[in-house]
Amino acid sequence: MATTNDLKNGMVLNLDGELWAVVEFQHVKPGKGGAFVRTTLKNVLSGKVVDKTFNAGTKVETATVDKRTMQYLYADGEDFVFMDLETFDQINVLGDTVGEAANYLLPEAEATVATHEGVPLYVELPTSVVLEITYTEPGLQGDRSTGGSKPATVETGATVQVPLFITTGEKIKVDTRDGRYLGRA
């Protein structure tokens, strides 16, 4: 148990039997009336985002989330198989749980897998990964005064917008949070 005064970004709460991660919080002390805490919460399993307001000092139940560094091994149908780097145990994580991270997962890549009571909740990747471009059209600058971009398919099958000078076979750095091109690797 914790109070709303102890909230931090990333903390996982157990509200009404569901797990919610604190995305953002703000302590508000109006000139008139009692203080309160305004939060933005994200459902860990469904991804639904809600705004919730608590009175200051209200007790909330925190959930114990175990974060472990694991290595991605392979895809098994809809599941993704990860191996714990300390115990070498393998766990299957549902594709829905992996979510957008699947676009940047390569075999043997390390990721952080968060679990609650042995159930995988979500997968966190490093903020950037290096991927090889498997296909992109040749870029023709033409008579444009500004630089343009073009779609490129990377080795995981995801599509990334890259500058016109990038060619097939090059390795690029991609931001895993939003899929942006960061530069050549």
UniProtKB/Swiss-Prot annotation:
One of its GO terms (biological process) is peptide biosynthetic process. It is found in: Cytoplasm. InterPro entries: Elong-fact-P_C, NA-bd_OB-fold, Rib_uL2_dom2, Transl_elong_fac_P/YeiP, Transl_elong_KOW-like, Transl_elong_P/YeiP_cen, Transl_elong_P/YeiP_CS, Transl_elongation_fac_P. Pathway: Protein biosynthesis; polypeptide chain elongation. The keyword Cytoplasm applies. It comes from the Bacteria. PANTHER family: ELONGATION FACTOR P, ELONGATION FACTOR P (EF-P) FAMILY PROTEIN. This is Elongation factor P. The lineage of its organism: Bacteria, Bacillati, Actinomycetota, Actinomycetes, Micromonosporales.
